[in-house]
């Protein structure tokens, strides 16, 4: 019987401990009703604010057409809105730094997708299926010493 008494004492101690408090994730909505998300691609980091509006997109205080020279960049950035059929329903303000134009485009795309997901959880399955919520983790491989590039080596001579 002493074994049973020890076990019940352990159970009582566990029950009397403070209850486990689960931390809920911080809401990513500010006072103005904007949804906030960050997107990353290569060395670029984009901070994106999304709010209900008329479809205006501002990147680093410039319009999207001024910031990105090619129309194909603009089309890929608008992909989440095309998939969710919400073109011209949200205004976007984003700041992006680091990397080149292609990396910045990918970071903005990732940030917009995450913000859209927060604004309406119904879009989660659509955006996930389109592969827009997954962070593209490919980065440039580092150069190794004794080689010309990351993989390129000097010409081998047998004699």
UniProtKB/Swiss-Prot annotation:
GO terms for biological process: translation. It holds the Pfam family Ribosomal_S9. This is Small ribosomal subunit protein uS9. It comes from the Bacteria. Keywords: Ribonucleoprotein, Ribosomal protein. One of its GO terms (cellular component) is cytosolic small ribosomal subunit. GO terms for molecular function: RNA binding; structural constituent of ribosome. Belongs to the universal ribosomal protein uS9 family.
């Amino acid at each position: 019987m002493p074994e049973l008494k020890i076990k019940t004492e352990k159970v009582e101690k566990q029950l009397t401990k403070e209850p486990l408090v689960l931390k809920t994730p911080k809401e990513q909505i500010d006072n103005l009703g904007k949804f906030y998300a960050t997107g990353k691609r290569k060395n670029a980091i984009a901070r994106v604010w999304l709010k209900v509006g008329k479809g205006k997109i501002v990147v680093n205080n410039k319009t999207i057409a001024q910031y990105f020279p090619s129309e194909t960049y603009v089309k890929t950035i608008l992909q989440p809105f095309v998939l969710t059929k919400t073109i011209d329903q949200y205004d976007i303000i984003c700041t992006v730094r680091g990397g080149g134009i292609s990396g910045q485009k990918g970071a903005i795309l990732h940030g917009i997708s995450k913000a859209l997901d927060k604004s309406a959880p119904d879009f989660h399955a659509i955006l996930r299926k389109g592969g827009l919520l997954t962070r593209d983790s490919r980065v440039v491989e580092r150069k190794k010493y004794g080689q010309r590039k990351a993989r390129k080596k000097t010409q081998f001579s047998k004699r």
